[in-house]
C-alpha cells in the first residue's frame, strides 16, 4: 500500500478545469487484483472526504475492461479502442453528435459507429446506461460482476451515506488505467 501527495504537472496545454500544475493525492495498492482492494480505495477516499467536511457527493465507477468489451461487441477493432475511447471521453463537451462525427472522421466501421451511437442514444445519456444492460451484452461478465460487487459492498458498508453508481462514460484515456476506475463528483 502506498499513499503520496504532492504537486504534479500535466504536459499539455492548460484549459478550463485542467490546470498544468495541481496538487494530487495518490492512494495505491500494488500487487493485488482483488475487488477488496478497489473497495478499500473507495472507502479510504470517501473517509478522507468526510473528514474534510465534504458530505454531498457520489462515487462514479467503471472498468476499462468492460468498456473495451462493449466497444468490441459493437464491432470496433482492438487496435481502434484507444482512439474510440479518446473520442468518447469528449462526449460531455461535444455531445453525441460530435462523438459520432469525430468517429466517422476517423473512418471507423460505419456499422460499429451506428450501433454505438444507437446504444448511447437509447439511454439518453451515457450516465443513464444501466450495468445490467451492459452485462447482458457481454460474453465475459467478469468485469460487470466485479463492478456490481464493489457497488453492493460499498453501499452495505457505508449505509448509503453517498451514492455509488456505474457510469460507462467514465473513460480515462491514459493507457495505464487498465481495470476499475472511479471518481468522486461533488453534488454541491
Language model: regions and residue ranges:
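Glycine-rich, mobile lid/loop segments that gate access to catalytic sites or pores
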Residues: 59-70
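Positively charged, Gly/Ser-enriched RNA/tRNA-binding surfaces
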Residues: 2-55, 65, 99-188
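Acidic, His- and aromatic-enriched active-site or binding-groove loops in soluble protein domains
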Residues: 75-101, 186
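Short Asp/Glu-rich motifs
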Residues: 68, 90, 176
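A generic structural motif
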Residues: 60-61, 85, 167-168
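Short secondary-structure capping/junction motifs at helix and strand boundaries
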Residues: 1-3, 53-59, 78-82
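Short coil/turn linker and secondary-structure boundary residues
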Residues: 62, 76-79, 91-94, 108-111, ...
Amino acid at each position: 500500500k502506498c499513499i503520496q501527495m504532492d504537486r504534479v504537472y500535466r504536459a499539455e496545454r492548460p484549459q478550463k478545469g485542467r490546470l498544468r500544475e495541481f496538487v494530487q493525492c495518490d492512494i495505491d495498492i500494488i500487487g493485488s487484483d482483488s475487488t477488496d482492494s478497489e473497495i478499500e480505495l473507495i472507502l479510504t477516499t470517501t473517509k478522507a472526504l468526510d473528514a474534510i467536511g465534504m458530505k454531498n457527493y457520489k462515487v462514479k465507477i467503471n472498468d476499462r475492461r468492460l468498456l473495451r468489451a462493449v466497444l468490441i461487441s459493437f464491432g470496433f477493432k482492438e487496435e481502434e479502442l484507444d482512439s474510440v475511447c479518446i473520442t468518447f471521453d469528449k462526449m460531455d463537451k461535444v455531445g453525441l453528435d460530435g462523438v459520432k462525427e469525430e468517429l466517422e472522421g476517423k473512418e471507423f466501421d460505419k456499422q460499429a459507429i451506428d450501433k454505438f451511437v444507437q446504444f448511447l442514444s437509447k439511454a439518453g445519456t451515457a450516465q443513464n446506461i444501466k450495468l445490467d444492460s451492459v452485462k447482458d451484452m457481454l460474453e465475459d461478465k467478469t468485469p460487470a460482476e466485479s463492478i456490481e460487487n464493489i457497488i453492493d459492498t460499498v453501499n452495505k458498508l457505508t449505509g448509503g451515506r453517498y451514492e455509488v453508481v456505474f457510469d460507462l462514460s467514465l473513460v480515462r484515456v491514459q493507457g495505464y488505467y487498465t481495470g476499475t476506475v472511479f471518481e468522486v463528483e461533488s453534488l454541491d
